[in-house]
Amino acid sequence: MLEQLYDSLVNAPVVKRGDYSYFIHPVSDGVPLLEPSLLEEISECILCYADMDVDRIVTVEAMGIPVATCLSLKTGIPLSIVRKRKYDLAGEIELSQSTGYSKGKLYVNGISEGDRVLIVDDVISTGGTLLVLVKALEDAGIKISDVVAVIERGTGSNDLRDAGIDVKTLVRVEVDDDRVVVEEVYSDNE
């Protein structure tokens, strides 16, 4: 399972941004090309792995959108996209997020108290965005049924678990000099 994801990661280009080695991948960056078969493989794995007894699928713009949309289409479960722009809709939840890459406000719409949600993300690095999102949704009376990210890099998943957030990931990677090393891949035997 996840052979295409594995192959695409080990063949992903790596660029330096300051002291940080950044891998370029279709799931995390949308370039060079996001193949439908890769989305299919990822979404099928998530359907087997995640608690799908939910009212909404939630993702933060931008790169969680392709995977979350695929899941929504396959299940008929509505999708709520956490946006970086304020809409001033009734019930809008505003939160401040800070990661190793950015700081800013995020806005949640289309989710109500009592809803059960699956949160889907492309990559967990620092875990900062997911930590703030989960806390804000829980404070609003929303039940987090599951949190799934396609790719895990760094300590963010462990930090989330230490904060009491059970997060599932499909692959764990690290960047070693100029290449991506896949350290762990989800198995349907787990």
From Swiss-Prot:
EC number: 2.4.2.8
Domain of life assignment: Archaea
EC supergroup of this enzyme: transferase
Catalysed reaction, written as an equation: IMP + diphosphate = hypoxanthine + 5-phospho-alpha-D-ribose 1-diphosphate; GMP + diphosphate = guanine + 5-phospho-alpha-D-ribose 1-diphosphate
One cellular-component annotation, GO: cytoplasm
Pathway annotation: Purine metabolism; IMP biosynthesis via salvage pathway; IMP from hypoxanthine: step 1/1
One record GO biological process: IMP salvage
Keywords per UniProt: Cytoplasm, Glycosyltransferase, Purine salvage, Transferase
Cysteines joined through disulfide linkages: none
Subunit record text: Homodimer.
The protein, known as: Hypoxanthine/guanine phosphoribosyltransferase
